[in-house]
Every structure is written in C-alpha cells, then in structure tokens.
C-alpha cells in the first residue's frame, strides 16, 4: 500500500511538472509585420475607394506617372476630418506650419497604434496646440504627397504605405515595412523668397 502511495505521488509530481513546463507561444508585437501591414493598408485602400460618406481622398505618390496602373502601396489615403478654408496648396519647396501625430498601425499592445512622433501631447486641438514648422521636402514621400493637397485649416488622418514612408529599413522607433498613420492639421505654409 505504501509503495502504491509513493508511485501515485511520483506520477502526479511528474505530470504536474510536465504541465508546468508546457511551452506557451504568444505572438510578438512585430511578428509577421510586413504581411500584417500589407493587409492593413489594403483594408484602408478598400475603405477609401468605397468612399461611402465622401470623406476620403486618394493621391498617387508624388512623381509617379498617372498613366500607369499602380498598386495600393503607391497611394496615400487621406480621411478628411475637417475641411479648412484656405484656397492654396503648399509646394514641395515650402515650409509648413502644422500640428501632427505619427503612429503605427493598431496592435494588441497599442490599440490606437504606437506613437512614434508628435508635435503635441494629448488630443489634437488646433486652438490649443502650438504648431511646428517643417520643410516639406525633408519629410517622407507619403507625408509631403498628402500635405501638398491640403489647404490651411484642413485636418486629415493620412495613411501612408511603408513604401512611401520609411520602407523596409525603418528608422528609430519605426520597424521596417510599417504603415504610417498621421493626424495632420495644416495651419499655414510659407514660400521661400526668390
């Protein structure tokens, strides 16, 4: 009887030990990042193309031939949050006065997307935030493509495929193949003096 009790105790100990050693594999934040970003930008492109409420604008990346057929990764998708009252658009060589917030696509840890850059804290409030001045030609292609279509006072949520952002190499705080999401408020712009 004593040997049965010892055998039972040993068996249970081994089973409990094996159960506690069972591997649990949880998906990492950036696992399959390239594929997930491709699916994400394709879903944004489909929503923008459907344009159910007329509040989307789609722009082919600056410098690409409009006569050719391009994939989703060659366009910038802009959701118009608020239309401004300006009448002119900034040029590539202009400096822009803007409020902006840059994020990655939503993920498990960051449901609103990981914020990698911002000119303000908290929520966008054009009457409260202090805008920054940027040279438009020193931003990524997707950013300057979108901003060149904005007018003073516009507030847009801009979705930039990785090809028009930081590409496969990424940059500090932004892994390669990342879709970029910018909340942009164009306050004004200035032309260089000739």
Each language-model region and where it sits:
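Sec-dependent N-terminal signal peptides
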Residues: 4-15
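C-terminal motif of bacterial Sec signal peptides marking the signal peptidase cleavage site
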Residues: 16-20
């Amino acid at each position: 009887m004593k040997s049965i009790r010892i055998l039972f105790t040993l068996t249970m100990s081994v089973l409990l030990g094996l159960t506690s050693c069972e591997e649990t594999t949880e998906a990492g934040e950036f696992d399959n990042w390239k594929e997930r970003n491709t699916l994400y930008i394709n879903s944004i492109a489909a929503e923008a193309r459907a344009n159910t409420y007329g509040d989307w604008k789609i722009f082919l990346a600056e410098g690409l031939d409009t006569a050719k057929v391009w994939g989703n990764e060659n366009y910038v998708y802009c959701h118009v949050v608020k239309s401004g009252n300006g009448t002119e658009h900034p040029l590539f060589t202009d400096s822009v006065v803007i409020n902006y917030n840059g994020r990655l696509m939503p993920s498990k840890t960051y449901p609103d997307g990981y914020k990698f850059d911002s000119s303000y804290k908290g929520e966008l409030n054009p009457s409260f935030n202090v805008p920054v001045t940027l040279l438009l030609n020193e931003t990524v292609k997707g950013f300057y493509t979108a901003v060149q279509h904005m007018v003073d006072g516009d507030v847009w949520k801009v979705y930039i495929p990785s090809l028009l952002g930081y590409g496969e190499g990424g940059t500090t705080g932004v892994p390669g193949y990342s879709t970029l999401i910018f909340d942009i408020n164009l306050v004004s712009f200035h032309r260089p003096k000739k």
